[in-house]
Amino acid sequence: LDENAIAARKAAWEDVLTIHSCEMYPPDEAWDAIYDAIEEGRQPPWPETHLHLEPQDTSLPGWLALLELIEDAARDRRETFSPKEILGAELWGQVITLPPSIAKLKHVKKLNLYRSSLLRIPPEIGEMESLEQFVPYTSYGLHWFPYEITRCRHLKSSTVSTRALYGNYKYRPTFPELDPVVEALIPARCSVCDRLLESRGEVHQRWLSLNVATDILPLLVNACSIECVEQLPAPAQGYVPFPHKGGTSVVQPPAD
């Protein structure tokens, strides 16, 4: 790459790195090899990626304020939920995952998570039955989403930072390994049939890239059985063509 291309690349990532840093955003020397591979139609030499499993500090004022805000929004039957606008950047920046209580937001049509520090979205988002618009744009720590988001039947619009996503078509970064099972991300119920997961040993975790609203999202599936894995829909065209366990051995289609 010439000097102008390198400068443009640095500028493009400057905003990202002020918010979030991990293997998804490697140093410049790694990008040289990644771009060379993309141009030659080869599998980019991405490093192994790891899921963000940092726990939420539930003693922080930002977390406590968010819990109250969710209760208020549920009680008032609000149709737009934009926590940063109410909490402010400092308090909102203390939140790295949404609480399960977002399931109470039955009337919310627009969920605005713009420029957050979020690392995870809980599976309870699937219970937001009125959700139509999902905006996690510039939330660069959100590399994947729970399969349960596909239960939001009215969801028709999304604005996601594509370059932050595992397996995205631009760069094809590696999916984290799901073997062994990542116990910290196992929900109470099967992602597919909603059966209670009585034993963590029975869970089958898979990655699946699907069309969700106006984006193709990498989704984490927690299935109770192989039968439920087999019931999953076909992945989006141009992505890994089957549910998989991630890792550097998974061959992805060439980057665009």
Range-by-range predicted roles:
Residues 1-104, 140, 154-256:
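The feature captures the LRR N-terminal capping module
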Residues 104-107, 127-131, 139, 148-155:
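Leucine-rich repeat
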